[in-house]
Amino acid sequence: MGMLTSLNSSKNHLSFMSQGVILITGATGHLGANLLRRLLSDGDTVRVFQRPGRDHEALQGLEVDIVYGDLRDPESVEVAVKGCSRIYHCAAMVSTIDGDQAHKREVYEVNVLGTRHILEAALRQGVEKVVVSGSLSATGHDPERPSDESMPFYPFDRQMPYGFTKHLVEHECLRAHAEGLKVVVATSCAIIGPHDYVPSRMGQVLIDYAKGSLRAYIPGGFEFVSTLDIVEGHVLAMKSGRSGQKYIISSTYMSVDELMTLFGEVTGCPKPRLRLPAGVMAVIAEVADRSWFRLFPNRPRRFTPGAVRLLQMHRKVDHRKARDELGFRPTPLSDAVRAAYEDFVRRGVIVPKV
């Protein structure tokens, strides 16, 4: 059973309940930490669902209630959901490795079963609406045109467990919608921005770049989204998103070369000299993955075959649906990179070079 506590013991929990509590899962993650701050600045009362023992740096100084528990435990999920009027389900186990069977099972249980538990509890507790964070990895890809919400996911392509589970998450949302729950999927691309405490994959690349430890990179490209934009997309989806629908939230497509140039402009550090051919890196990643897989099957790695494949797909998206139905308007990605860098400097993660 989950345990309810608060970072602000002077706040009466019953007053929180009467004001219409918003629940956020994954509030210590990159998206969740930024969404939490946005909701608090809007004057909302927020509860977060947190695994015991997790770092609370992302929550320090913020007036929130915490329910401790695990998405895989329906009872603790029920405790978290009870009394909430709306839910942002941002928590997920993100991974670009295939991993062993135990790893795949954990990704499935956290992402798919965890979402199922949230949605089922929301139905039982009479929650008004749920916004679930989706992933572009669960959206179909056509090299001839940008991806949109109508593009089907093809399960027999070479898929990473993470992308496949996020596809199944969308099915869980459709099932809950059919059962009467108002639920919307807000699909994210690669996120860049401040309050990146873990840090994220892109955040770590920026840190390494600023420290001069990023020796090489590979060409490619991807669709990126600023924390400001992905948070705005979630808030808009909660406000006016149609139940049973998903909306892709993106700022812009950017090549890796362009991203490295932008990192250089923001940090004042030179671009890595070594630009590895994509084909060569793909082979190296495959060989290294097989070697590392035998020794360390579940250890995160920078250049996995899955990550290389994603960059080489040059995925672009069409976010007209979010623009037309939600009123979404993207902001410059350069602002997000600068905000991320300044936040890392403020927290002492990066020491600026003079």
Report residues per predicted region:
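Substrate-positioning beta->alpha
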Residues: 117, 168, 201, 218-238, ...
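N-terminal Rossmann NAD(P)H-binding glycine-rich loop of SDR-like oxidoreductase domains
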Residues: 20-42
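NAD(P)H-binding glycine-rich loop region in Rossmannoid oxidoreductase-like domains
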Residues: 54-60, 64-113, 121
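Conserved beta-loop-beta element that borders a ligand/cofactor-binding pocket
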Residues: 134, 171-194
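Mid/C-terminal beta-alpha module of Rossmann-like enzyme folds, strongest
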Residues: 233-301, 319, 324, 334-354
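Conserved Rossmann-fold NAD(P)-dependent oxidoreductase catalytic core, especially the SDR/UDP-sugar
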Residues: 109, 113-162, 184
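Glycine-rich "substrate-gating" loop/helix at the edge of Rossmann-like oxidoreductase active sites
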Residues: 158-161, 189-198, 217-228
